[in-house]
From Swiss-Prot:
Residues 1-23, 356-376 are annotated as: Disordered. It comes from Neisseria gonorrhoeae. The lineage of its organism: Bacteria, Pseudomonadati, Pseudomonadota, Betaproteobacteria, Neisseriales. Probably part of a tripartite efflux system FarAB-MtrE, which is composed of an inner membrane transporter, FarB, a periplasmic membrane fusion protein, FarA, and an outer membrane component, MtrE. The gene is farA. This is Fatty acid resistance protein FarA. The keyword Transport applies. Pfam families: CusB_dom_1, HlyD_3. PANTHER family: MEMBRANE FUSION SUBUNIT OF EMRAB-TOLC MULTIDRUG EFFLUX PUMP, MULTIDRUG EXPORT PROTEIN EMRA-RELATED. Mediates resistance to long-chained antibacterial fatty acids (FAs). Function is dependent on the MtrE outer membrane protein.
């Protein structure tokens, strides 16, 4: 009985040993496979870093920036109307606020009347000049008659038909006529001098002065309307109706949201291979990773962020600790991307720059054009001047 039981036990022991060996073999194979997979993954990661990732610089310290165009009046006054509020979209030239214009309207009407008077005065001076010219012609005719009378009497005096007294009277008449001609010529010269010479009505000094006053009054009246200096969205409105404002005081701001960029603050160690013109990809926290903006490096700041702070760092001390500095890098965005997915100033962005692309260390092209104030259109007041000059024509 004992020998019969021992044989099954030996067989079971052999089976257990076989299973254990198989398990150990499988475990070694798994470890080998895992080790090989890890090595391949590390090699792939190293290759990817060498081929792609080492040519990318990324930062999350980036924010949307743009121009905040201040709206200020060009003259002081009391605010009568405020036509736009925060978040309103406006176009360049739109009226944003209106100042009280009662005094300016009166000044404008007074200037128009002064121009009318200047034109009429010029007409009177023209008439006086014409009258002085007629007097010169009349006096010259009197002189010619006196000279003819003197010649006749002189011829008769030789035969004794005319007395010496009559001949003396004739000579006196000629002298008086000559003096009258000289006086008339002087009066004509004075009238022409007062007229300003042979120039057109518009070019007369008095008329030019009156036109200048009229344009000045019209400009002051026009400046009671505070207009938008650029296309954009109204922000930071602080002006209220009835408020007394001075020239240059900020009333509100206009932000051109179509012209925004990103200021990305890269570490100084990340700028080694970064150049102007290199492409960039940007992601906004507002829209998430599914929306990618295209852009390019436009320029580097002239100094680090701390260099332009109100209180620059003072490193000339014994307990100095080196801190990696960050340099603001401007990234311009593709206009089409911004139009499809508008951004707001101050939004957070994640920026990746492809440093393997070609670029220039220094910008050789001028930057984007800055907003300009709307130039004054003088056509309206010029038409008014033309109407006044035409109505005053003889």
């Amino acid at each position: 009985m004992k020998s019969g039981n021992s044989e099954p036990n030996l067989m079971e022991t052999h089976t257990d040993e076989t299973k254990l060996q198989n398990t150990q073999v499988k475990r070694k194979r798994r470890l080998t496979a895992l080790t090989l997979l890890f090595a391949l993954s590390a090699a792939a990661a190293g290759s990817a870093f060498f081929l792609w990732w080492q040519h990318e610089e990324e930062t999350e310290d980036a924010y949307v920036a743009g121009r905040v165009v201040q709206v200020t009046p060009q003259k002081g006054g009391t605010v009568r109307k405020v036509l736009h509020d925060d978040t309103d979209a406006v176009k360049k030239g739109d009226v944003l606020a209106v100042l009280d214009d009662d005094n300016d309207v009166l000044a404008y009407e007074r200037a128009k009347n002064e121009l009318v008077q200047a034109v009429r005065q010029n007409r009177r001076q023209n008439a006086a000049t014409s009258q002085a010219g007629a007097q010169v012609a009349l006096r010259r005719a009197d002189l010619a008659r006196a000279q003819d009378d003197l010649r006749r009497r002189s011829a008769l005096a030789e035969s004794g038909a005319v007395s010496a007294e009559e001949l003396a009277h004739a000579r006196t008449a000629v002298s008086q006529a000559q003096a009258a001609v000289k006086a008339a010529l002087a009066e004509e010269s004075s009238a022409r001098a007062a007229l300003g010479g042979d120039v057109s009505l518009r070019e007369q000094p008095e008329v030019q002065t009156a036109i200048g006053r009229l344009k000045d009054a019209w400009l002051n009246l026009r400046r009671t309307q505070v207009r938008a200096p650029a296309d954009g969205q109204v922000a930071k409105r602080s002006v209220q109706v009835g408020q007394q404002v001075a020239a240059g005081a900020p009333l509100m701001a206009v932000v051109p949201l179509s012209d925004v960029w990103v200021d990305a603050n890269f570490k100084e160690t990340q700028l080694r291979h970064m150049k102007i013109g290199q492409p960039a990809e940007l992601v906004s926290d507002l829209y998430g990773k599914q929306i990618v903006y295209r852009g390019r490096v436009a320029g580097f700041s002239a100094g680090t962020g701390s260099a332009f702070s109100l209180i620059p760092a003072q490193n000339a001390t014994g307990n100095w600790i080196k801190v990696v500095q960050r340099v603001p890098v401007r990234i311009v965005l593709n206009r089409e991307d911004v139009d499809r997915h508008p951004l707001r100033i101050g939004l957070s962005m994640t920026v990746k720059v492809d440093t393997s692309a070609a670029g220039a260390p220094v910008s050789k092209t001028p930057g984007a054009a800055l907003p300009e104030m709307e130039s004054t259109d003088w056509s309206e007041v010029d038409r008014t001047v033309d109407e006044i000059l035409g109505q005053s024509a003889p």
